[in-house]
Amino acid sequence: MKLTGLSRASVHSYLPYTKGIYNAAEISLNAERCRTYKIRQEKVRLLKEIPSEENLWQSIIAFQDYPFKTATGLPFRYKLKIGKNGEYNRELLIDRREKSKSLAWSSVVLAFENSKKVSEEVKKPKALGDIRGVSYIYPILWRFGLIRVPEAIEKKMGKQR
């Protein structure tokens, strides 16, 4: 430092940073979470911009294993079934601790179409229609920002948005 006439901070600023691993073969869990979060944000933004069945499907794929809560506060997650050809079947497997339920894609689409017709607050899941599994679809549509719900229900579902 006496040789260069620079301060200690200046000398260290020119040295390469050695504390981090760049372009590692395996990414950290935090990096994976950040990547998933960005993908989910992008899919939801696209769905809000262009509310189509295809964009809904892409959002559904992105939110697999996301911790949702029903309007009554019961936690659940879903996964998509994988078909024989290795692609996703359009069937959601709802994972509720002890029980697993299957939810058809047609039910999700029906609730989605009904949500587009509703402009005011959706007070309860059944307001979207008499649809099988609507209590699980309701928090998903709310999380995607497609419906508004009462504040009391929002608190039970965890204010995730």
What are these regions (language model features)?
Residues 2, 19-39, 152-154:
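Short Lys/Arg-enriched helix C-cap and helix-to-coil transition segments
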